[in-house]
């Protein structure tokens, strides 16, 4: 800005200042004209003198005195502010060093390198301050010399007073610095708003760490070393760049310039430029000092933060997590404290701690003076919760002397507290006792504890999920409303389906971290404390336990309802544990008796099958009724046993008679065979006599030529009479006829227990499937589907269950060709291999075999490979993976060509399969067989009637 056209107007400026600030000359006793030796005041005075002499009309001495006094006061106050700021910085640094030394003595873990660095920093700061003081003294001496040179031509008395040497001026400035701080309200320059530390400390909202508003706005410096350079060149450059403090000063001083004498402008420009350069240099020094202070302040803040973090990391090797809310935020108002005996961690607000005594192992060092213990440690017990089966966590005592988890008491509806602030004592009598064991927990790993305690439900609408509070806490399903929300019940829980996934994830992580820390042994925690501290903790713990015992003996009896409320014994987790321990000591296994908790309404006779044990009249009646029923059942069992013995004796007698009848039946069958052969010969003779071929009647037809029915199983029998008693093919005994199972291949009966492996129930037979024994399944038939049944693996691939199949296209040359099969005309039978009979086997007779001797797999003949290549329905190609062969017609079908279409093979291991056509033809054969039986019976009746 060009200030050459502006002239100084001293009289209007002085008058306006005095009027604006209500100046009183009586208070101007501390201002002396002869002490105006500062650079700014002297510079201004010389400038005024040069202007007045150049114009030919020198200004009055009073105006010069006022101008000098104003400039002097401004300079003195600036120096006082500088010195006070430096002293405060030194005092704060000393205090910081003292605090660091104390922390080093307490912790004893600070490295030596940091100490050496800090000492070097302190020495550098002291050197910088000494340099600044020397620089100030030099500038003061230069200003005094310049003011003396400027005031020597003047003849006014003030010029005489300003002629003393440099030592006098320095002593005057030191006296002014030593004087108490006093604000000069008569200054015209809008200087920086500096506030003393005393006034800042008196403010309510003042924070020394955030005191950034009083610092000047300066241009960014590349480094801290830029503020430590000596010389005036750097200061002048900074003054040109800033333009904030110096420009304002120049503008304020430019307002007082006089525009009436243009002739003296050339003579005053040089002196004015010198004065302005000096004033700007002083302002730059002040700005640089403030910049240095601000940078040192920021460095101190970062150092304090870094040290506090290191100290906290050394003190807290882990993050404390509250065992109630699973939060890890520890604040001064709600600190996470730790029991000095068991090591459990909890918020003060979550546990109802009044805050008077804090834990030694807590996160706040200033409060870590008094040991703190949870209620269970104070009483010296290992409690068991009445509301859940879990034993971890922090407990509160009830008014009846029982114990519950504090988290269970908060989340279970109906539980009340005597003192809401301290969350004690807990009252369970207001809760309905029917809730005990009413619902089954869906998260309990042990089903024996699923109905212990009280289960809460999911707070989502219409959700029927029930779980224990601590089981839900393990899964991260517990939630709490915010403090600003006004809700009657701020504690709620959701099941896995309705809970927030992210919220559940971090709670689950915190719970696992809490459990991993709680598993730390007490010996490891004791190692962290000195023997003296551990002894002090144990002594205080014994005092607390003595007080708790005394309070328990003098505590008034809690209120209980007059009528005793029943509660199931199985709903108490502690009772279940004791019963399990008793069973273990008695040698009784609890695993073989599964607990059936299903509440069945009633049995067939209207009586309840099971009722949970409880001290109620209903359970007593059920108990006596059960005993009476047990006696009746035992008597009935004894009677049935006697009847069984009698029937077994009768069965033995009947077996003897049965064997005799079988022998006589065999003789009669042989006689019948002879007579039938004679009849056939006579019938053939009659045919030759008549010259015609006569059809043999059914009565003369040989049994081997008869088509066996479906019920007969396809085997040729010499008698149409069914067997009355069947014998087991393995044990050769005929007992337990209802447990005999017929093999559809070998037509032998087997006991379920005699099979390998034994069966527990009868296999299910369907219309299109049958059952065969293990012997027939291994090597008795040519069915390859059972052997080649594809088993689906977990990864989605399939493999053969018993053997690996060779490729379809590979056919060995040394394999003999299969025998030619000739289809049998007329009607088809139900038996296996009846649609196509090889020429080599068609003349063999099927003799009912006796029990097949079990042979090892190595002695059996290798099975012929069953290759399936063409579908009988669509005539398309295929292989063993997508074709199935019918056991009757031996034709192949695609899985999708069946009716209904299937995705996999209908054959199962141990079962056969026939197509739909064979199944319909077999039903027709049964109908034809029934018709033939009816015709034969009619012929027999006709033959008998003529004889009569």
Swiss-Prot record:
Q: Where is the composition biased (Low complexity)?
A: 36-47, 140-174
Polar residues bias: start-end ranges: 288-297, 936-948
Which residues does this entry mark as bearing Phosphoserine? 26, 29, 84, 91, 196, 208, 290, 294, 298, 302, 308, 359, 530, 781-782, 835
Q: Where is this region: Disordered?
A: 22-302, 811-862, 920-948
Instruction: List positions binding Zn(2+) 3.
Output: 385, 388, 405, 408
**Key words, A-Z:** Chromosome, Coiled coil, Cytoplasm, Isopeptide bond, Metal-binding, Nucleus, Phosphoprotein, Repeat, Ubl conjugation, Zinc, Zinc-finger
What are the Acidic residues biased-composition ranges? 60-71, 199-212, 233-256
**What residue ranges carry the coiled-coil annotation?**
630-678
Q: Specify which residues bind Zn(2+) 4 according to the UniProt entry for this protein.
A: 441, 444, 468, 471
Where do the annotations place Zn(2+) 7 binding?
Answer: 743, 746, 773, 776
Per UniProt, Zn(2+) 8 binds at 871, 874, 894, 897
* Positions bound to Zn(2+) 6: 728, 731, 751, 754
Q: Zinc fingers (PHD-type): which spans?
A: 319-380, 439-499, 725-779, 868-921
This protein's record includes keyword Transferase = no
Task: Write down the InterPro entries for this protein, in alphabetical order.
Answer: EPHD, Histone_Mod_Regulator, Zinc_finger_PHD-type_CS, Znf_FYVE_PHD, Znf_PHD, Znf_PHD-finger, Znf_RING/FYVE/PHD
What Gene Ontology molecular-function terms does this entry list?
Answer: histone binding; histone reader activity; zinc ion binding
CDD domains linked to this entry: ePHD_PHF14, PHD1_PHF14, PHD2_PHF14, PHD3_PHF14
Q: Locate the residues binding Zn(2+) 9.
A: 886, 889, 915, 918
Database matches in SUPFAM superfamilies: FYVE/PHD zinc finger
One GO CC term of this entry?
nucleus
SMART domains (UniProt xref): PHD
Cite the binding residues for Zn(2+) 1: 322, 325, 347, 350
What is stated about domains? The N-terminal region, including the PHD-type 1 and 2 zinc fingers and the C2HC pre-PHD-type zinc finger, is required for binding to histone H3.
What is the protein named? PHD finger protein 14
Q: Which organism is it from?
A: Homo sapiens (Human)
Primary gene name: PHF14
């Amino acid at each position: 800005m060009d200030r050459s056209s502006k002239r100084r107007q001293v009289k209007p400026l002085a008058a306006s200042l005095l009027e604006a600030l209500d100046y009183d000359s009586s208070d101007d006793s501390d201002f002396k004209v002869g002490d105006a030796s500062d650079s700014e005041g002297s510079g201004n005075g010389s400038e005024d003198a040069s202007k007045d002499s150049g114009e030919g009309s020198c200004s009055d001495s009073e105006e010069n005195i006022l101008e000098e006094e104003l400039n002097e006061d401004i300079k003195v106050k600036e120096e006082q502010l500088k010195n006070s700021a430096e002293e405060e910085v030194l005092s704060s640094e000393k205090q910081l060093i003292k605090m660091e030394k104390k922390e080093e003595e307490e912790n004893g873990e600070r490295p030596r390198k940091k100490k050496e660095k800090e000492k070097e920093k302190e020495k550098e700061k002291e050197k910088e301050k000494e340099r600044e003081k020397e620089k100030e003294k030099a500038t003061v001496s230069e200003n005094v010399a310049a003011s003396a040179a400027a005031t020597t031509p003047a003849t006014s008395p003030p010029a005489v007073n300003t002629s003393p040497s440099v030592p006098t001026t320095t002593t005057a400035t030191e006296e002014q610095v030593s004087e108490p701080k006093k604000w000069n309200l008569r200054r015209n320059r809008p200087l920086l708003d500096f506030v003393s530390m005393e006034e800042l400390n008196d403010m309510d909202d003042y924070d020394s760490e955030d005191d950034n508003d009083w610092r000047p706005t300066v241009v960014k410096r590349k480094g801290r070393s830029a503020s430590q350079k000596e010389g005036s060149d750097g200061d002048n450059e900074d003054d040109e760049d800033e333009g904030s403090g110096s420009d304002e000063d120049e503008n304020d001083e430019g307002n007082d310039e006089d525009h009436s004498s243009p002739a003296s402008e050339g003579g005053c420009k040089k002196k004015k430029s010198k004065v302005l350069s000096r004033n700007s240099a002083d302002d730059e020094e002040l700005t640089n000092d403030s910049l240095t202070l601000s940078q040192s302040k920021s460095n101190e803040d970062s150092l304090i933060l870094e040290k506090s973090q290191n100290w906290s990391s050394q003190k807290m090797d882990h993050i404390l997590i509250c065992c109630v809310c699973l939060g890890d935020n520890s604040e001064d108002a709600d600190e996470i404290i730790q029991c000095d005996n068991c090591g459990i961690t909890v918020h003060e607000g979550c546990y109802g701690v009044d805050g008077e005594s804090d834990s030694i192992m807590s996160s706040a060092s200033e409060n870590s003076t008094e040991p703190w213990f949870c209620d269970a440690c104070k009483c010296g017990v290992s409690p068991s919760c009445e509301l859940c089966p879990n034993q971890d966590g922090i407990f509160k005592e009830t008014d009846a002397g029982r114990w519950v988890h504090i988290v269970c008491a908060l989340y279970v509806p109906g539980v009340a507290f005597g003192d809401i602030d301290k969350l004690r004592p807990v009252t369970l009598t207001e809760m309905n006792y029917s809730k005990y064991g009413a619902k089954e927990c869906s998260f309990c790993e042990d089903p024996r504890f699923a109905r212990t305690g009280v289960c809460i439900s999911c707070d989502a609408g219409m959700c029927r999920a029930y779980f224990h509070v601590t089981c839900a806490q393990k899964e991260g399903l517990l939630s709490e409303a915010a403090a600003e929300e006004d809700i009657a019940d701020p504690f709620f829980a959701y099941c896995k389906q309705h809970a927030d996934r992210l919220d559940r994830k971090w709670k689950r992580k915190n719970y696992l971290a809490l459990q991993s820390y709680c598993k730390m042994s007490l010996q490891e925690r004791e190692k962290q404390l000195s023997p003296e501290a551990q002894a002090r903790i144990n002594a205080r713990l014994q005092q607390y336990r003595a007080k708790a015992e005394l309070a328990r003996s003098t505590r008034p009896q809690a209120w209980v309802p007059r009528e005793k409320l029943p509660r199931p014994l199985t709903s108490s987790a502690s009772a279940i544990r004791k019963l399990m321990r008793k069973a273990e000591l008695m040698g009784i296994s609890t695993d073989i008796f599964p607990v059936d908790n299903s509440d069945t309404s009633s049995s067939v006779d209207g009586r309840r099958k099971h009722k949970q044990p409880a001290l109620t009249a209903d359970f007593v009646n059920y108990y006596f009724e059960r005993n009476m029923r047990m006696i009746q059942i035992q008597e009935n069992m004894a009677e049935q046993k006697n009847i069984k013995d009698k029937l077994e004796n009768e069965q033995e007698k009947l077996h003897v008679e049965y064997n005799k009848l079988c022998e006589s039946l065999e003789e009669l069958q042989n006689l019948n065979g002879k007579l039938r052969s004679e009849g056939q010969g006579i019938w053939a003779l009659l045919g030759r006599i008549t010259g015609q071929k006569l059809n043999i009647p059914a009565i003369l037809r040989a049994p081997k030529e008869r088509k066996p029915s479906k019920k007969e199983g396809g085997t040729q029998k010499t008698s149409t009479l069914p067997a009355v008693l069947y014998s087991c093919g393995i044990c050769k005994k005929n007992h337990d006829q209802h447990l005999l199972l017929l093999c559809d291949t070998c037509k032998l009966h087997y006991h379920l227990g005699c099979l390998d492996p034994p069966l527990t129930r009868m296999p299910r037979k369907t219309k299109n499937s049958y059952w065969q024994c293990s012997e027939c399944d291994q090597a008795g038939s040519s069915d390859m589907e059972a052997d080649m049944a594809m088993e689906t693996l977990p990864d989605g691939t399939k493999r053969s269950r018993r053997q690996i199949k060779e490729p379809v296209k590979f056919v060995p040359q040394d394999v003999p060709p299969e025998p030619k099969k000739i289809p049998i005309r007329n009607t088809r039978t139900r038996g296996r291999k009846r649609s196509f009979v090889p020429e080599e086997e068609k003349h063999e007779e099927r003799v009912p075999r006796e029990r097949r001797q079990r042979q090892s797999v190595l002695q059996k003949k290798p099975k012929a490979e069953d290759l399936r290549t063409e579908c009988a329905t669509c005539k398309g190609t295929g292989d063993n993976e997508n074709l199935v062969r019918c056991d009757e017609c031996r034709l192949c079908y695609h899985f999708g060509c069946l009716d209904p279409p299937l995705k996999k093979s209908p054959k199962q291991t141990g079962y056969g399969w026939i197509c739909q056509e064979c199944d319909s033809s077999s039903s027709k054969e049964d109908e034809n067989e029934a018709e033939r039986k009816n015709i034969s019976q009619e012929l027999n009746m006709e033959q008998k009637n003529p004889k009569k």
